Amino acid sequence: MNFGEAIKALKEGKRVARTGWNGKGMFLYLINGREFQNALKYGYGEYEHEPTITSSIAMKTAQNTIVVGWLASQTDMLADDWIIIE
């Protein structure tokens, strides 16, 4: 699938990856800002001008770390080899 379809899948709660990442355990997923905020019991308007947590794309890396705020490269955006990880 293409990058747009991969983004749609992320928004539906699915994990996605590029076929070239296979075997490395790498994938992307969406961290829902509102759910994260609720889990932290943060953002209930208790303080004036309290910020909210926005959603972001995270990557599980080959080194078994989580990178929050993953950014797509031009190659990633133009690729048609995106897959859904079950």
Predicted regions and their residues:
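Extended non-catalytic interaction/regulatory regions in multidomain proteins
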Residues: 1-62
